[in-house]
């Protein structure tokens, strides 16, 4: 073996561990078929496709291929309120899928929420799909560890999300770890450099540890990511036509609220520059901001999703909007799922919740 071969053997790359697709339906668009075929052959893969590109049908077809090939079910994990939506999508395309809340695994594809993973055994499944996989980084270490440990016991794995950020290296690391490639700390140590000269001293000073790509490692790093993931913002990224996927412009309207009171001990308000001042300003103006939002929501009669960040905001909005339902962190998983589904299905006109609770999949 020469030196070049020796170095090549040390190159990080996700090996193929899948199979040739056994079913490729006509309802998939050309770029979707390309991604699904690659993911099936890969065996353990991530599809980072932007909003509106059809991740759900791609994930269902991938899962159906694994189930048909192995004769065993595939577990399809989703955030709260997305499970029922996924089953409806499967029914629309004639794919056998059931929703399970108690660990039953009798279906071709078994759809369940991440929060119910403890009801299932990895030994019962040939494959697992993690929908909205960006949610992994929002889970606490124990929950994320449970999901990763479960996936490692299953031979075929697929991650899907529209929000994977190429500059969020931790997210790429947790995705790689869940798929069975490099763990996120192994990834950081191999490809990145800690910006603090002494991380222990930095932590003592309260500094946040930052990582940056080593200069010589940038190309190998992205080659490694491309060996197990595909990131697509539009079909033309893969050489296909964009015509059917041109989304309308997103309109953002900003509304200014005049504070009705001054900070304690102040003759006039000052700009809230620091985080402490911003938090105080948000708490001081809860009443004014909620009143403005409620006025707009009540005047339209249209479905509305209202994001809040403080419990006081959520409670105030719920009181000001008569037909609103609120999903809060203290609610049980069943209650959260019930209310999120009620909004998604049109049974509740207004939903009030925090982004960290309901942003995934709505």
Predicted regions and their residues:
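Conserved interdomain hinge at the start of the Helicase C-terminal
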Residues: 277-309, 316
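Conserved Walker A/P-loop ATP-binding site and its immediately adjacent core
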Residues: 56-61, 71-92, 166-171, 309-311
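Conserved P-loop NTPase motor "coupling/switch" region that bridges the ATPase
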Residues: 72-73, 127, 135, 144-236
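Conserved pre-motif I regulatory segment
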Residues: 7-48
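Walker A/P-loop
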Residues: 42-62
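Conserved helix-turn-beta segment of the N-terminal RecA-like "Helicase ATP-binding" lobe
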Residues: 81-103, 179-183
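Conserved helicase ATPase core of P-loop NTP-dependent helicases/translocases
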Residues: 305-307, 314-318, 322-358
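Conserved helix/coil segment N-terminal to the catalytic DExD/H
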Residues: 102-127
């Amino acid at each position: 073996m020469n030196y070049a071969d020796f170095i090549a053997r040390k190159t990080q790359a996700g090996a193929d561990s899948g199979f040739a697709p056994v079913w490729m339906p006509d309802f998939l668009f050309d770029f979707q078929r390309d991604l699904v075929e690659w993911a099936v052959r890969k065996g353990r893969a991530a599809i980072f496709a932007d909003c509106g590109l059809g991740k759900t049908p791609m994930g269902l077809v991938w899962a159906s291929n694994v189930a048909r090939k192995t004769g065993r079910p595939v577990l399809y994990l989703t955030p709260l309120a997305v499970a029922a939506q996924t089953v409806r999508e499967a029914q629309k395309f004639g794919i056998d899928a059931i929703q399970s809340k108690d660990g039953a695994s009798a279906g071709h594809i078994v759809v369940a929420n991440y929060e119910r993973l403890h009801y299932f055994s990895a030994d019962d499944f040939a494959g697992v799909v993690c929908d909205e996989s960006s949610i992994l980084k929002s889970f606490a270490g124990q929950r994320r560890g449970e999901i990763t440990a479960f996936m490692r016991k299953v031979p075929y794995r697929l991650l899907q999300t529209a929000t994977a950020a190429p500059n969020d290296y931790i997210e790429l690391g947790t995705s790689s770890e869940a798929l069975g490639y490099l763990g996120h700390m192994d990834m950081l140590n191999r490809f990145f450099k800690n910006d603090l000269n002494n991380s222990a001293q930095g932590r003592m000073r309260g500094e946040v540890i930052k990582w940056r790509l080593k200069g010589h490692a940038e190309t190998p790093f992205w080659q490694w990511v491309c060996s197990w993931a595909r990131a697509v913002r539009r079909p033309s990224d893969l050489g296909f036509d964009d015509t059917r996927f041109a989304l309308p412009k997103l309109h953002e309207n900003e509304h200014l609220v005049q504070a009705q009171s001054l900070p304690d001990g102040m003759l006039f308000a000052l700009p809230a520059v620091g985080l402490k001042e911003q938090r105080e300003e948000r708490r001081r103006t809860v009443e004014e901001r909620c009143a403005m939002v409620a006025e707009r929501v009540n005047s339209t009669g249209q479905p509305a999703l209202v994001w809040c960040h403080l419990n006081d905001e959520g409670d105030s909005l719920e009181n000001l909007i008569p037909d609103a339902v609120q999903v809060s962190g203290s609610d049980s998983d069943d209650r959260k799922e019930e209310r999120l589904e009620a909004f998604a299905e049109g049974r509740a006109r207004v939903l009030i919740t925090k982004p960290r609770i309901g942003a995934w999949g709505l």
